[in-house]
């Protein structure tokens, strides 16, 4: 993928979200050096720390030694810790998870997006990762194990198994009611599209959330959905998935099992960005829901 495609991807995201790029700054008055050759430490209170954005907390942690990082995170809930680890460097992730009791580490992994949890576990030795997987709830464990089967540089390696779907034969009203009451849909933090599946979980089409909420309630979804969406298979290289996201101005692309057409997950635009953009560029992009 050529360098100008990276820039197009960044521009596409900013245009789609209609957001201006902002730089998040941590005031230096909240950070102090203990001694000449000591690491940085925070003066900000624990209460204030937990109210900060996960990405900002992660930026702070990356500049602290692992011992201080672990101490700062003691008062975090499992969900807060998971959100922060998703934004942290692999080194911080490994240090924090290693410092937790295995049962709590598994609870934190359950709160993370499956693709993020899979990336974290892939960096651990087999014995440690297997121990944590065995402690996770069955459904979460299955999702993560599925992702770990795919090469790290493939679409399957960066996809998430959390996406909003409805039966293809639904009306608009039935689809909206399903999304309001379905627990899996409530867990989807990246609901820009709704995927229409048949009883065999094969993809029949896709409809944007905007089109869904503005369509007449009594009409069949078949009158509104795109029955020929852009898709990738789990072994499609990450860079190709990112190129498709940029080319077609997509917020996500479905990952399909090529032989059965069963829908496995989605590659979201933020994961596509993480794949191809240099770190310095990523930090200038707006934050996404679930990112």
Where are the predicted features?
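Hydrophobic packing positions in regular secondary-structure scaffolds
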Residues: 1-291
């Amino acid at each position: 993928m050529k360098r100008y495609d990276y820039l197009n991807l960044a521009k596409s995201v900013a245009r789609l979200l209609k957001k201006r790029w902002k730089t998040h700054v941590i005031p230096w008055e909240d950070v102090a050096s203990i001694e000449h050759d000591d690491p940085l430490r925070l003066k900000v209170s624990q209460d204030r720390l937990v109210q900060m954005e996960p990405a900002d907390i992660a930026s702070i942690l990356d500049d602290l030694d692992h011992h201080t990082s672990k101490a700062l995170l003691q008062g975090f809930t499992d969900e807060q810790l998971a959100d922060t680890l998703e934004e942290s460097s692999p080194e911080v992730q490994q240090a924090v998870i290693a410092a937790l009791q295995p049962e709590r580490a598994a609870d934190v992994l359950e709160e993370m997006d499956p693709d993020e949890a899979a990336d974290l576990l892939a960096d651990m030795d087999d014995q440690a990762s297997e121990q944590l997987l065995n402690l996770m709830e069955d459904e979460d464990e299955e999702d993560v194990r599925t992702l770990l089967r795919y090469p790290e540089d493939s679409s399957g390696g960066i996809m998430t198994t959390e996406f909003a779907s409805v039966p293809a034969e639904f009306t608009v009203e039935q689809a909206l009611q399903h999304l309001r009451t379905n627990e899996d849909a409530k867990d989807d933090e990246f609901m820009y599209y709704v995927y229409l599946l048949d009883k065999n979980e094969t993809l029949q089409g896709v409809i944007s959330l905007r089109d869904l909420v503005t369509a007449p309630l009594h009409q069949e979804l078949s009158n509104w959905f795109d029955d020929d969406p852009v898709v990738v298979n789990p072994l499609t290289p990450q860079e190709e998935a990112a190129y498709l996201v940029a080319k077609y101005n997509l917020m996500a692309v479905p990952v399909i099992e090529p032989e059965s057409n069963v829908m496995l997950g989605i590659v979201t635009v933020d994961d596509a960005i993480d794949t191809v953009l240099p770190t310095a560029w990523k930090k200038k992009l707006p934050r996404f829901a679930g990112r």
